[in-house]
Amino acid sequence: MGFSELFTNADGRLSTTASIQFWGFVAATGVLLYSVYLDKPYVPEMFSTFLFACVGTAATKGVANALSQRREQGKEQGREQGREQE
């Protein structure tokens, strides 16, 4: 398994969602380690907020893609039904 497989699709193209999740995890780990090193009292809140932002971005993109695909399928079915009625 190559390093690039962590954030690309099966065909080798860059995956936006996987990239956001992977680099978000890397950044969150860096923020956590740096905050622990500085001995800050707000580490859990900052870390969880950052992770929610990273996960939320990818999840929102997934929901938008699913709704878009459903809308396209509905349009195609409507066209097919219109052709059958003619």
From Swiss-Prot:
Annotated region described as Disordered, given as residue ranges: 67-86
Topological category with respect to the lipid bilayer: Multi-pass membrane protein
Classification via Pfam families: DUF2644
Domain of life assignment: Bacteria
Keywords: Cell membrane, Membrane, Transmembrane, Transmembrane helix
Claim: Cell membrane is one of the keywords in the record: yes
Entry's localization field: Cell membrane
Protein name, per record: Uncharacterized protein HI_1495
Organism: Haemophilus influenzae (strain ATCC 51907 / DSM 11121 / KW20 / Rd)
Lineage: Bacteria, Pseudomonadati, Pseudomonadota, Gammaproteobacteria, Pasteurellales
